[in-house]
Amino acid sequence: MPANERRWQTGTLVFDQVGVFFVRRLRRLRRFFKSMNYEISRKVIGCAMKVHREMGCGFLERVYENALSIELRRKGVDFERQVSLRVHYNGEPVGHYIADIIVGNELLLELKALQSITGPCKSQLLNYLKASGLPAGLILNFGSKSLEFKRMAKTQ
């Protein structure tokens, strides 16, 4: 092994510096999913899959929001629709966002009806998470042949 290469061995696994980075990241992700109510996100994704399976793609976001609300209500999930999120700067209001659905005051849902989930969609969800103070969110895209979803957590 070259002198400048650093390696660590744990049990039978050997990690170089890059491997250690990924192990630490994996541990952070595990903590995130333990802190977030994973059951709620699983239930929401299941409801979204049922809506997409029955309706298919091609409708407006509002139609999917209405259908998902019906399905969440049937499953007994506590949620709010079209929640206004105020953005402040030095105590002064500077704008607001409208979140599609907030589930159980811990998970923000952003519904899309696009070809695929893009970078601006992810940025929008992160901005909503900052404005709301919620720890995690889901982008649910009903616009493709199969339901796309992306879990995201507030990093700051």
Predicted regions and their residues:
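Nuclease catalytic cores
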Residues: 37-45, 57-61, 65, 69
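Short, low-complexity, charge-dense intrinsically disordered segments
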Residues: 1-34
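Conserved catalytic cores of phosphodiester-cleaving nucleases, focusing on short active-site segments
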Residues: 56, 79, 99-117, 128
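A short acidic/basic microdomain associated with nuclease active sites
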Residues: 75-88
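Nucleic-acid nuclease catalytic cores
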Residues: 112-156
